Amino acid sequence: MSLENAVRVVSTDEKGNQASSTKLIELLHSRVDALTTTNIELTTKLQELLGNLDTVQQRERKLKESAASLRHEGDNVTLMLNRKERKLTEVKEAIVELTTKLGEAKEVNHSLKQKFEDEGLTSEESLRESISEVKTEYDTLVKSHEIYESSNDIQCKSLEDRFSQALLIHGENMKALDGTAEQILANNSELVSQLRATENKAESARTSIRNASIDTAAKVDLEKWLFLYKEAQRICEEFASKTDTKLPDELQAIIDDPVLKELDARFALDEIQYGKTRNKRIPSNPLLSNSQAAARRVASPSANYSPRVSSAQGSLPGITRTPSMKVNNKFSDSNAQEVPTRLHSHGSRSKRSSMVFK
């Protein structure tokens, strides 16, 4: 009995008799219970079937993998067989070629044996004839060699005679050259003496020019001018750093002048040399005056300048300083590019010129 039929029965029973509704409900409950039990049984069967399906699928996968591996192995085996077959065919072809070559070689050997047997007697006669021809050719070569050797001896004798004549001519020429060489040496000595005289004159002119340049440098007193320049440079740089301003291009160009930098470096080098020679020759004196220390600070451009200037430092160019500094430098003729520092005393005053001219 289906559910629709039950509903129809219910509808008919409601019209006819409502008392049988309870029975119908109980009947429906029993039907529902039966359907649930059947549903549960079907679900359990379905789960079992699904599990069986999974196992079957796994087995199928394994079988497919094994089949693929077997196919791969079969392909490899077929490839190996094909290679072996190719090799066998190649070997068979090589055997056929070798058999044909062997047959040809046998035929050639047989023909050569026949030729050797036929021409064995004639070959000895031909060899004897060729040997006799070689002997006659050798005899002719020996005779031609003897003739050539005799002609060479005659030519060598004529060459020896010519060589002896050339030696005699060479000796006469050497005697003439010796006379001209003595004359050239005499002329060379005269030229050397004249050259030495001109060198002495040039050296005297260089020394006079050097002394004049040193005198002018001492009169100008470049050390004080350099000190004033360094002091002005320091003040300008200090002013620019304090006011956080940039110096004009013209002033910066004057500060970066390579000539002034070269003078500064040379004064520093002279001061170092002066300190070394003074430390070697003069013992340290604790009673050194402040004026001499100030003079050394003025001469050294690398010293730290202070705004307070001593009386010796603040004097204008042309005014002499009280300390007297001597620098002993030797002048070498081989290095004529640098002129050493000299000391020129004018009366009771002494000045030190540390200018290096090129």
Curated annotation (Swiss-Prot):
<feature type="compositionally biased region" description="Polar residues">
    <location>
        <begin position="301"/>
        <end position="314"/>
    </location>
</feature>
<dbReference type="InterPro" id="IPR031398">
    <property type="entry name" value="She3"/>
</dbReference>
<feature type="coiled-coil region">
    <location>
        <begin position="39"/>
        <end position="118"/>
    </location>
</feature>
<feature type="compositionally biased region" description="Polar residues">
    <location>
        <begin position="321"/>
        <end position="338"/>
    </location>
</feature>
<feature type="compositionally biased region" description="Basic residues">
    <location>
        <begin position="343"/>
        <end position="352"/>
    </location>
</feature>
<feature type="coiled-coil region">
    <location>
        <begin position="181"/>
        <end position="215"/>
    </location>
</feature>
<dbReference type="GO" id="GO:0003723">
    <property type="term" value="F:RNA binding"/>
</dbReference>
<feature type="region of interest" description="Disordered">
    <location>
        <begin position="279"/>
        <end position="358"/>
    </location>
</feature>
<keyword id="KW-0509">mRNA transport</keyword>
<keyword id="KW-0694">RNA-binding</keyword>
<dbReference type="Pfam" id="PF17078">
    <property type="entry name" value="SHE3"/>
</dbReference>
<keyword id="KW-0813">Transport</keyword>
<keyword id="KW-0175">Coiled coil</keyword>
<dbReference type="GO" id="GO:0051028">
    <property type="term" value="P:mRNA transport"/>
</dbReference>
<keyword id="KW-0472">Membrane</keyword>
<dbReference type="GO" id="GO:0005789">
    <property type="term" value="C:endoplasmic reticulum membrane"/>
</dbReference>
<dbReference type="GO" id="GO:0048309">
    <property type="term" value="P:endoplasmic reticulum inheritance"/>
</dbReference>
<keyword id="KW-0256">Endoplasmic reticulum</keyword>
<comment type="similarity">
    <text>Belongs to the SHE3 family.</text>
</comment>
<comment type="function">
    <text>RNA-binding protein that binds specific mRNAs including the ASH1 mRNA, coding for a repressor of the HO endonuclease. Part of the mRNA localization machinery that restricts accumulation of certain proteins to the bud and in the daughter cell. Required for the delivery of cortical endoplasmic reticulum into the emerging bud.</text>
</comment>
<protein>
    <recommendedName>
        <fullName>SWI5-dependent HO expression protein 3</fullName>
    </recommendedName>
</protein>
